[in-house]
């Protein structure tokens, strides 16, 4: 057995043991740990930023691009936000132990579902060290143990944050092994983590498409994931023109890099001649490059031609594919073929069209008269989220605390027997 395998197995064994204690942990103890972590982060800001400086120095030497350097940096503001996030999660209701509706059977037996932790969650992520705190806090609050494997470029930052998390757990008399940070940058550690079915119950990958595609191929442990966010907005013939303009503009320009950003705009042919030029003008003035079908190009002179590849691309930048469609059916066919199952929206005042779209578009989130950038756990009232899932099994859409739990059936009787 290699040293990496031994390291990972030890982490797994410790996490499994800690998960049993976390399953029993009270909401009060979990909240005490979270609040202790918040204080420790503020008090330890100088040490955190010193560790972060080591990562930044190495990243600059390796030519890391400015946008990624920004994500890696633990500024005063980001440290404050991590502490605030911990306090917010402490204030959320604890899902563990909650009971669903109770059904009383004809023999008087009472049947219900109880929320319980998943067990041990492996989380694999890139660049942003704040994910260490977000992920640890959500797993802790939902009664799970977790093994965190961050990007190699953030190793010093992640280890420093992991030490704070473990100190917070200890302060609340919870097992420090409930949150462990992988201390090696060897990629073999990831390969081992996603195959440890005896110790890990689920993997949550947060990163680029390449990372998630690789894990989907290699993993033997179930994944909660989304591969990409190729999101669509369809402007129906019955759309309010001003509302359509505002929604399309916000869906693309709110933040290019979020996974809910609109990547393809579909416009009904009946309103395309009047609506598309208005939307195109606003987006072009904002610096967005448009790539359209032949009908779109005829309506907006100078628009670049879209290739077939554009329809399936998550740009995460100031580029938008545009297509004029014959009707609602063609719009939904386009989404079914090219969409990623993440988030898709219709703009319409036609109730029947809205209901059909929500019923028939098979995405984890389907909107009516809203921009796709609302794809976020806070916006859904879930509080913090661990990520967004396009899976059909278990969690789907933004995954908050409840998504990090499962259920068991609990039955109560008075001595009934089965005849």
Swiss-Prot record:
The gene is proA. Keywords: Amino-acid biosynthesis, Cytoplasm, NADP, Oxidoreductase, Proline biosynthesis. Belongs to the gamma-glutamyl phosphate reductase family. Catalyzes the NADPH-dependent reduction of L-glutamate 5-phosphate into L-glutamate 5-semialdehyde and phosphate. The product spontaneously undergoes cyclization to form 1-pyrroline-5-carboxylate. This is Gamma-glutamyl phosphate reductase. Its EC number is 1.2.1.41. It catalyses: L-glutamate 5-semialdehyde + phosphate + NADP(+) = L-glutamyl 5-phosphate + NADPH + H(+). One of its GO terms (biological process) is L-proline biosynthetic process. It is an enzyme of class 1 (oxidoreductase). It comes from Bordetella avium (strain 197N).
């Amino acid at each position: 057995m290699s040293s990496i395998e031994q390291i990972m197995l030890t982490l797994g064994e410790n996490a499994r043991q800690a998960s049993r204690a976390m399953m029993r942990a009270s909401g009060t103890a979990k909240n005490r740990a979270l609040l202790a972590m918040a204080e420790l982060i503020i008090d330890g800001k100088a040490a955190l930023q010193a560790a972060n400086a080591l990562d930044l120095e190495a990243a600059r030497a390796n030519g890391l691009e400015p946008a990624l350097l920004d994500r890696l940096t633990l500024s005063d503001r980001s440290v404050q936000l991590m502490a605030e996030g911990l306090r917010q999660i402490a204030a959320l209701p604890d899902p563990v132990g909650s009971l669903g509706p109770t059904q009383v059977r004809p023999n008087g037996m009472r049947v219900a579902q109880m929320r319980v932790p998943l067990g041990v969650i492996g989380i694999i992520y890139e660049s942003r060290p704040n994910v260490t705190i977000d992920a640890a806090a959500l797993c802790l609050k939902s009664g799970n143990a977790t093994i965190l494997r961050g990007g190699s470029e953030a190793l010093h930052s992640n280890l420093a944050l992991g030490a704070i998390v473990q100190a917070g757990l200890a302060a609340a008399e919870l097992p420090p092994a409930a949150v462990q940070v992988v201390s090696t940058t060897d990629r073999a550690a990831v390969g081992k983590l996603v195959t440890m079915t005896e110790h890990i119950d689920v993997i949550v990958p947060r990163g680029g498409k390449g990372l998630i595609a690789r894990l989907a191929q290699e993993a033997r442990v179930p994944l909660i994931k989304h591969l990409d966010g190729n999101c669509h907005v369809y402007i129906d013939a019955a759309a309010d023109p001003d509302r359509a303009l505002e929604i399309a503009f916000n869906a693309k320009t709110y933040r290019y890099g979020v996974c809910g950003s609109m990547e393809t705009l579909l416009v009904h042919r009946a309103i395309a001649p009047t609506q598309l030029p208005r939307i195109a003008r606003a987006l072009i003035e904002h610096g967005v490059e448009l790539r359209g079908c032949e009908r779109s190009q005829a309506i907006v002179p100078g628009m670049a031609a879209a290739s077939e590849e554009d329809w399936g691309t998550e740009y995460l930048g100031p580029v938008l594919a545009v297509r004029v469609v014959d009707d609602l059916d063609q719009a939904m066919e386009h989404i079914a073929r090219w969409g990623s199952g993440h988030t898709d929206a219709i703009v319409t005042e036609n109730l029947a069209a809205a209901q059909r779209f929500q019923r028939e578009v098979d995405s984890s989130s389907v909107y009516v008269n809203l921009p796709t950038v609302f794809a976020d756990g806070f916006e859904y009232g879930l509080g913090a989220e661990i990520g967004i899932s396009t899976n059909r099994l278990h969690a789907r859409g933004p995954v908050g605390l409840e998504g990090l739990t499962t259920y068991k059936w609990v039955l109560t009787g008075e001595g009934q027997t089965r005849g």
